């Protein structure tokens, strides 16, 4: 089972925020996640990012592959 770290959309119409989740790569975007990693809210200025680094490290050690967007958020959060 290949696992991805990716975003799932939450919120209302035109007021979106995103949860960062670990999910089976074959599952649909709104499918049941294996774990919740954090969230990303682009609607506030500056954009709010909260990531549980321990969970991220755990999933990366298990071979999870982050999407390009999540990878950028991880880099931004590490600074």
Curated annotation (Swiss-Prot):
**Can you cite an annotated GO cellular component?**
cytoplasm
Q: Which Pfam families match?
A: Ribosomal_S16
Quote the InterPro entries the UniProt record gives: Ribosomal_bS16, Ribosomal_bS16_dom_sf
Q: Which GO terms describe its biological process?
A: translation
Q: Does the keyword Cell inner membrane apply?
A: no
Residues crossing the lipid bilayer are: none
Keyword Mitochondrion tagged: no
User: SUPFAM superfamilies per the record?
Assistant: Ribosomal protein S16 (SSF54565)
**Molecular function via GO:** structural constituent of ribosome
Q: Which UniProt keywords apply?
A: Ribonucleoprotein, Ribosomal protein
User: Which HAMAP family does the UniProt record give?
Assistant: Ribosomal_bS16
Q: Which family does it belong to?
A: Belongs to the bacterial ribosomal protein bS16 family.
Identify this protein by name: Small ribosomal subunit protein bS16
Species source reads Oleidesulfovibrio alaskensis (strain ATCC BAA-1058 / DSM 17464 / G20) (Desulfovibrio alaskensis)
Specify the taxonomic lineage. Answer: Bacteria, Pseudomonadati, Thermodesulfobacteriota, Desulfovibrionia, Desulfovibrionales
Encoding gene (name): rpsP
């Amino acid at each position: 089972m290949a696992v991805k770290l990716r975003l799932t959309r939450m919120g209302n119409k035109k007021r979106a925020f995103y949860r960062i989740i670990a999910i089976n790569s074959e599952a649909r975007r709104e499918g049941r996640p294996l774990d919740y990693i954090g969230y990303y809210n682009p609607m506030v200025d500056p954009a709010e990012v909260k990531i549980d680094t321990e969970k991220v490290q755990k999933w990366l050690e298990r071979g999870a592959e982050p999407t390009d967007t999540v990878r950028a958020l991880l880099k931004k959060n590490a600074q």
